[in-house]
């Protein structure tokens, strides 16, 4: 089983990492190519391209300037400890043991606009480059064209080491990021968990809660060493419960009612 997550815009380089082990990202050469292109942009270009504030554009202009193809604990941090958004509050990697993180290293992947595909312990230098950014490059009009089938092939290399029910991809990424994966070329079926909360008289996806729940699901897989997708139906963290009637073989729906 491989579970894929989206990255986070918010980053934490202040909190010291509680583990020393780390690995190097697989697509450093590709990331370097993107950085070379990003360095040609002015802060105003970055603000316009990414629809961000001038201070944030200046911050990322400097990040691109500082970025190095050499990764060390001095200039980078393990990805799953550096990302700090809703998904990663749910995953809460800083409270996982080194043994748990070793398991996550084999079963969790993070999709990234700059780095393509990251393992949890891959070193990450600070950046901002969302997968949906229409950043024209030598390979095409945007990052989907840039990555092509590279991410899918990298996932297949991992999936092909699994067998039976364990050869499955669990999609806990956003639509924007999972578009970088080509399901028809995958060497495994895809299961997408969907998290819904009761609000306004019906169940609906509430972005903040759904993002957090994706991280909780990834943690559930890691802590329980899950390899069989049927075991995902036992997920019941923070009030969610699997709804068989609303689910099918490729979409697992989890619902909850809070405060009723």
Swiss-Prot record:
- Which InterPro entries does the UniProt entry name for this protein? YaaA
UniProt GO cellular component terms? cytosol
GO BP terms in the entry? response to hydroperoxide
Q: Which Pfam families does this entry report, sorted A to Z?
A: H2O2_YaaD
Signal sequence, start to end:
none
Homology family: Belongs to the UPF0246 family.
Protein name, please?
UPF0246 protein Bcen2424_2223
């Amino acid at each position: 089983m491989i579970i894929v997550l989206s990255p986070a815009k918010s980053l934490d380089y202040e909190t010291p990492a509680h583990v020393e082990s780390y690995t190097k990202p697989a697509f450093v050469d590709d990331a370097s190519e993107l950085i070379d292109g990003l360095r040609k942009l002015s802060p105003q270009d970055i603000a316009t391209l990414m629809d961000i504030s001038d201070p944030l554009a200046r911050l990322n202009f400097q990040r691109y300037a500082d970025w190095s193809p050499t990764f060390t604990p001095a200039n980078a941090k393990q990805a799953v400890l550096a990302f700090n958004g809703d998904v990663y509050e749910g995953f809460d990697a800083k409270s996982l043991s080194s043994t748990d993180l070793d398991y996550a290293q084999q079963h969790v992947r993070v999709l990234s606009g700059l780095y393509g595909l990251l393992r949890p312990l891959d070193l990450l230098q600070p950046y901002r480059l969302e997968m949906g950014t229409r950043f024209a490059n030598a390979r095409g009009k945007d990052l989907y064209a840039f990555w092509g089938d590279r991410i899918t092939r990298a996932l297949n290399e991992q999936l092909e080491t699994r067998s039976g029910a364990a050869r499955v991809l669990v999609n806990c990424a956003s639509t924007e990021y999972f578009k970088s994966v080509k399901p028809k070329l995958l060497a495994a079926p895809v299961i997408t968990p969907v998290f819904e909360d009761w609000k306004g008289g019906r169940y609906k996806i509430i972005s903040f809660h759904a993002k957090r729940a994706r991280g909780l699901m990834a943690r559930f897989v890691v802590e329980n060493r899950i390899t069989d997708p049927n075991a995902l139906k036992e997920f019941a963290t923070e009030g969610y419960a699997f709804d068989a009637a609303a689910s099918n073989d490729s979409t697992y729906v989890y619902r909850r009612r809070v405060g009723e």
